[in-house]
Regions:
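Membrane-proximal intracellular helices of multi-pass ion channels
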Residues: 1-281
């Protein structure tokens, strides 16, 4: 539930070699990616808030869609086992990466560039705001996508008034601007870190994957820093750069100071409550 990714065994998840263990971990890791305020509402019997929540729907769709792509890719490249085995391995990897848990029972880098691309996108997306997961957060990306759609519509209809709405509630222009600023800073840090690591001799795949992994608090990156590798070979300046990327990820902590309003005496649905505007900052 903490999406930390550490294990009591050096071999990690592979130590148990148990499909049952992987399914249980997948379920609880997926739940950990949901806004905790919504999880609380579900535990107290109000499942409608969880099931009808727009961000939860997007989160579920991304997980299922990415899992389907991975399964399809494994079958096309003839790297699949039985259907159950392929489904379990794919779902586990997708959930553990999108929630920034970082457990990897398989080396997606060895599967090929197609799979690495999928998991890098999941690292960037992250799970829902109000969870312990890293990444840009789906809630912010939903607001960004809707705002982009509105701006494209205004190109044709300049006088149109189209507020960004989440679960039927309008999001103020001020909050949209702050979300755009957050995403911009996130991307700028990602680009800067990738350039520095590239200058130190890392391939573009390794530089980008390593920076994104640290920025989103994932763990495994891409190339030599993927699930089968580590960060030991990176020069000291590169390690300092990655540590700075990890510190930049603490921008997400800004939402935590406001999250207490939801968990202590304020149990309103996050996307129907005014505090949603702060949690998306």
């Amino acid at each position: 539930m903490a999406t930390g990714g550490f294990s009591t065994k050096q071999a990690g998840i592979n130590f148990w070699n148990s499909s049952y263990t992987e399914y249980v971990m997948t379920i609880f890791t997926f739940i950990a990616g949901i806004n905790f305020a919504l999880v609380y509402r579900a535990v107290t019997g109000d499942f409608k808030k969880l099931l009808h929540n727009e961000e939860t729907k997007w989160y579920t769709a991304i997980v299922l869609g990415a899992t389907l792509l991975v399964i399809t890719g494994l079958y096309i490249t003839d790297q699949n086992g039985s259907f159950e085995d392929t489904f379990r391995r794919s779902l586990f990897l997708v959930v553990t990466i999108v929630t920034s848990t970082g457990y990897t029972g398989d080396d997606y880098v060895a599967w090929g560039p197609f799979f690495t691309t999928i998991f890098l996108l999941l690292m960037f997306f992250g799970a829902c705001a109000g969870s312990t997961c890293g990444g840009a957060k789906i809630d912010r990306l939903v607001v960004l996508a809707k705002n982009t759609k509105n701006e494209l519509y205004r190109v044709i209809h300049p006088n149109a008034i189209l507020p960004v709405r989440v679960n039927g509630k309008a999001v103020s222009h001020e909050i949209v601007s702050k979300i755009l600023a957050f995403i911009l800073v996130y991307v700028m840090v990602l680009i800067a870190g990738s350039i520095i690591l590239s200058a130190l001799g890392l391939s573009m795949e390794e530089a980008f994957g390593s920076t994104l992994s640290c920025l989103s608090n994932i763990g495994p990156g891409a190339g030599s820093t993927g699930p089968a590798g580590n960060y030991a070979f990176i020069p000291d300046l590169g390690k300092w750069t990655l540590e700075s990327s990890c510190s930049s990820a603490d921008l997400n902590c800004l939402q935590s100071s406001f999250y207490s309003h939801l968990t202590f005496g304020k149990t309103h649905n996050i996307v129907e409550d005014k505090y949603f505007l702060y949690i998306c900052i």
